[in-house]
Amino acid sequence: SSRTVLSNISNIQRRPQVVGKIKKEDGVALEEKAPLNKGLGRMVSQSNLISDVQLKTTKIIPAYQDIADVEVPINAMINSFTELEVDDIDLEDLGNPTLCAEYLKDIYKYMNKLERRLEPSDYMAHQAEINFKMRSILVDWLIQVQSRFNLLQETLYLTIYIIDRYLSKQNVKRAELQLEGVTAMLIASKYEEMYAPEIGDFVYITDNAYSKEKIRQMEQKMLKTCEYDFSNPLCLHFLRRNSKAGAVDAQKHTLAKYLMELTLVEYEFITKLPSEIAAAALYLALKLIDDSNWTPTLAHYSGYTEDEILSTVSKLSILTLSMDNSKYQAVKNKYSASKFLRISLIPQLKGHILSKFAERN
């Protein structure tokens, strides 16, 4: 293709049977709701809509026992949490093999260690040909591709993580940045999706800028660079746990998801741990909706006290307030849809509470 790569990241459809308006923003051309005429459209089901988990308001907690200790009297467990002023949010799930309540303490302890071990580094200083703006353009476009392909939220978060981890270890040419982005989404799709898009779908969405062979070669390179390890915890994993601990409703949970997704586009947040971003997003959502408190139960399960996340909350508030003037509108447009409760359009996102937190920075 003679197209200048990245300066015009494009997925312009050239097939005559595809219809839909073309929208260009900051060099990115994207169709609005024009279906792909490949196998992807048939394979993706309604179950892949980004609906997230069903929120429960039951009281549960990561058990402090190994499996051999499950038979400890329930009253003893309740007493231990009463002393800590922490609700046992897992009590009702004990004995349910599909929920693994007996193992949750160890699972989240391991996830906290893992997010630190696999954390991407601050890599932009050693990149000669790319910069913050190019990364933001790429991520903003990938968010639109994720919506277009109807991929899971986990796939999107893992895609951005793979990009940042790869860039932490490799210098990338400007002309290959979009290639790296679609290859990361291909890898993430194979890892997360029941039916992953085909390589041809990514060739198509990039307007044939890269061949199938180029994508395969980049896939091999990225897999080796990342040592075939994509087991890092995602913000979503921690948010779901926190939402359960806070017994939050769908509006607060969706607002926290929106705030978290805004951070994907901003390079400033790549050195923040997923657990911290999840805690800060839920904290801000609680304050914006009804000024709910950050309870001892939330502090216990998130691993963060109110004081420990206020700095990140402030940065997140500044980012949210900047959205009206931002060139990168993919997340805001995505969450203006009815299936996301039009959460990006609520008046609280322009109110004095958000401004108050932003001023603390």
UniProtKB/Swiss-Prot annotation:
InterPro entries noted in UniProt: Cyclin, Cyclin-like_dom, Cyclin-like_sf, Cyclin_C-dom, Cyclin_N, Cyclins_cyclin-box
Biological-process GO terms, alphabetical: cell division
Keywords from the UniProt entry: Cell cycle, Cell division, Cyclin, Mitosis
Gene3D superfamilies the record matches: Cyclin-like
One Pfam family, short name: Cyclin_C
Membership in a protein family: Belongs to the cyclin family. Cyclin AB subfamily.
PANTHER family: CYCLINS (PTHR10177)
Purpose: Essential for the control of the cell cycle at the G2/M (mitosis) transition. Interacts with the CDC2 protein kinase to form MPF. G2/M cyclins accumulate steadily during G2 and are abruptly destroyed at mitosis.
Identification of the protein by name: G2/mitotic-specific cyclin-B
Native source species: Hydra vulgaris
